[in-house]
């Protein structure tokens, strides 16, 4: 692997953050190189419909939106490389990265590798992803208006998803393997109010044993009692797995400051909101954001990262 590709700006990741960063960087004549990663288009490629993207009132599919973003980046001469980075060295300049196909060096780096939703690992769960199984209520909840859904999990994410869906679905079944929830008190209070006076039903000491369905999609779930091992079937049209996300930041461990796997960035008070603990390295999208995790917020931070990188490169005379 003697071939080394150098660029002023290298962007890792091909989701909304990466492609937006590419558009802004290319328009600034930084001649960015974007390395797609293994999941081209990011998490949105697993979303069937996107109906909250401003300007697209009719809605569009996740893959279609990402293809449009890719074309937009290419229009301004972003070089897109289909490769996966498996190691990095940020200890010297230029930064050095090693991919499956070749090595890369760059004067500035934007990390937009995203985060991956955690799943339970059931074969049936995998089989119905995008056809009734989701990990994002704000993305896909709309499609279950006035229908019964299940949420699996016991932390803040699960409770928030259940509360959100309770305003859309006819009935929300919250499934948790324990009898108490690992969530903030204010969320627990809201949850219990919805249980007592609303449309949320708790299934504690239960685990998801199987997702049930047919060629049309999910039709129900099979739950297992953690104390008796007895099983029961529940009729639902959607299943939301809410057991957290894993930021795709493993290759940067020990080199960048992180918190729970998410890359830490600056406050932005000095116009450097996306700068990491290493000058010249910036982060955007879900790899640094564990709160919002929306396509539009990822795109926004991608824009910010490109502007921050442009200022940095200018300050270095690059």
From Swiss-Prot:
Pfam family, one: Pyr_redox_2
Disulfide cross-links: 136-139
UniProt keyword list: Cytoplasm, Disulfide bond, FAD, Flavoprotein, NADP, Oxidoreductase, Redox-active center
GO molecular function: thioredoxin-disulfide reductase (NADPH) activity
Gene3D superfamilies: FAD/NAD(P)-binding domain
Subunit structure: Homodimer.
The protein's name in its UniProt record: Thioredoxin reductase
High-level lineage: Bacteria, Pseudomonadati, Pseudomonadota, Gammaproteobacteria, Vibrionales
């Amino acid at each position: 692997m003697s071939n080394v590709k150098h660029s002023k700006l290298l962007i890792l990741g091909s989701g909304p953050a990466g492609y937006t960063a590419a558009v802004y960087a290319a328009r600034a004549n930084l001649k960015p190189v974007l390395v797609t990663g293994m999941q081209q288009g990011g998490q949105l490629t697993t979303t069937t419909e996107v109906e909250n993207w401003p300007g697209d009132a009719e809605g569009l599919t996740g893959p279609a939106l990402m293809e449009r973003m890719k074309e937009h980046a290419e229009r301004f001469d972003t070089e897109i490389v289909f490769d996966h980075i498996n190691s990095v060295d940020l200890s010297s300049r230029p930064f050095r990265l090693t991919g499956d196909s070749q090595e890369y060096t760059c004067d500035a780096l934007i990390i937009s590798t995203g985060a991956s939703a955690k799943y339970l690992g059931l074969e049936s769960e995998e089989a119905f992803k995008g056809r009734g199984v989701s990990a994002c209520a704000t993305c896909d909840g709309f499609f279950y208006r006035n229908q019964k859904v299940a949420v699996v999990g016991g932390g803040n994410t699960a409770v928030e998803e259940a509360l959100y869906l309770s305003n859309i679905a006819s009935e929300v079944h919250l499934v948790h393997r324990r009898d108490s929830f690992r969530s903030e008190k204010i969320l627990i209070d809201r949850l219990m109010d919805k249980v007592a006076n609303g449309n949320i039903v708790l299934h504690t000491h239960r685990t998801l044993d199987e997702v049930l369905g047919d060629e049309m999609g999910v039709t129900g779930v099979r739950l297992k009692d953690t104390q008796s091992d007895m099983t029961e079937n529940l009729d639902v049209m959607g299943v939301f797995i809410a057991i957290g996300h894993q930021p795709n930041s493993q290759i940067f461990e020990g080199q960048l400051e992180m918190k729970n796997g998410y890359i830490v960035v600056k406050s932005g008070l000095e116009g450097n909101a996306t700068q990491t603990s290493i000058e010249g390295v910036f982060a955007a999208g879900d790899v640094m954001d564990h709160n919002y995790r929306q396509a539009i917020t990822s795109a926004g931070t991608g824009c910010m990262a490109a502007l921050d990188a442009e200022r940095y490169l200018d300050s270095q005379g690059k």
